[in-house]
Amino acid sequence: MAIRCVASRKTLAGLKETSSRLLRIRGIQTFTLPDLPYDYGALEPAISGEIMQIHHQKHHQAYVTNYNNALEQLDQAVNKGDASTVVKLQSAIKFNGGGHVNHSIFWKNLAPSSEGGGEPPKGSLGSAIDAHFGSLEGLVKKMSAEGAAVQGSGWVWLGLDKELKKLVVDTTANQDPLVTKGGSLVPLVGIDVWEHAYYLQYKNVRPEYLKNVWKVINWKYASEVYEKENN
């Protein structure tokens, strides 16, 4: 199984590069599926390897492909002066571009327990969480409750409001990035609550997924972003 996974990832990488090269020749900015810094099965038992592989290779790849296609169509429409098509493409760009942005953050927000996943945040982020939410447990409880309450599909976020210099918890619908809730918001931790993120393992019990995902949250990465942006 592991050999097949590696082979499929290499094949996928080759297809991504070929597609990107063709679009670059035409002078169009393109985006590619980022590699994961861990194996698909590395987050088990919190998130199954099957979910991670499908989520990454199928769902995220689809957002990247559709985003690039929409940008290519936008380029053509702008060159033709086709204003109606330019306007029509905005929803596809927002949805698929947002899907690419959000998932690129999500993969970094996760880490195997052997590499620090689930370890509590330290330093200034840990102190800020205690100040704003009382404790890490208080933050986890709040984010899990708000994530479980999302109607349909979306995301739950821990963000930094750079203008107000404070941490915030918010949700976004569908694939809207956190920045759509405010230009000064920087995502620190984003948790995908679309069914494709958990259904194969947790069925329709989203709260159980939200309970276990914290066991593989990469607080080290969140702390690095916080340190960089909170200045």
Curated annotation (Swiss-Prot):
Q: Does Metal-binding show up as a keyword for this record? A: yes
Quote the InterPro entries the UniProt record gives.
Fe/Mn_Superoxide_Dismutase, Mn/Fe_SOD, Mn/Fe_SOD_BS, Mn/Fe_SOD_C, Mn/Fe_SOD_N, Mn/Fe_SOD_N_sf, SOD_C_sf
Enzyme class, top EC level, equals oxidoreductase
Task: Supply the EC number(s).
Answer: 1.15.1.1
- Key words, A-Z: Manganese, Metal-binding, Mitochondrion, Oxidoreductase, Phosphoprotein, Transit peptide
Q: Which GO terms describe its biological process?
A: embryo development ending in seed dormancy; response to zinc ion
Q: Which cofactor does it need?
A: Mn(2+)
PROSITE patterns named among the record's database cross-references: SOD_MN
Q: How is its activity regulated?
A: Activated by MTM1.
Report the Gene3D superfamilies cross-referenced here. Answer: Fe,Mn superoxide dismutase (SOD) domain, Iron/manganese superoxide dismutase, C-terminal domain
Binding-site positions, Mn(2+) = H55, H103, D192, H196
A single GO molecular function term of this UniProt record: superoxide dismutase activity
Please give the superkingdom of this protein's source.
Eukaryota
Q: Which reaction does it catalyse?
A: 2 superoxide + 2 H(+) = H2O2 + O2
The entry's free-text remark on the cofactor is: Binds 1 Mn(2+) ion per subunit.
Query: Which Pfam families does the record associate with it?
Result: Sod_Fe_C, Sod_Fe_N
Q: Where exactly is the transit peptide annotated in this entry?
A: 1-29
Query: Record's GO cellular component, any one?
Result: mitochondrion
| Residue positions where Phosphoserine is found in the record | S124
Q: What is its main location?
A: mitochondrion
**UniProt function note:** Destroys superoxide anion radicals which are normally produced within the cells and which are toxic to biological systems.
Q: What is annotated about its quaternary structure and interactions? A: Homotetramer.
Annotated family: Belongs to the iron/manganese superoxide dismutase family.
Protein name as it appears in the record: Superoxide dismutase [Mn] 1, mitochondrial
- Originating organism: Arabidopsis thaliana
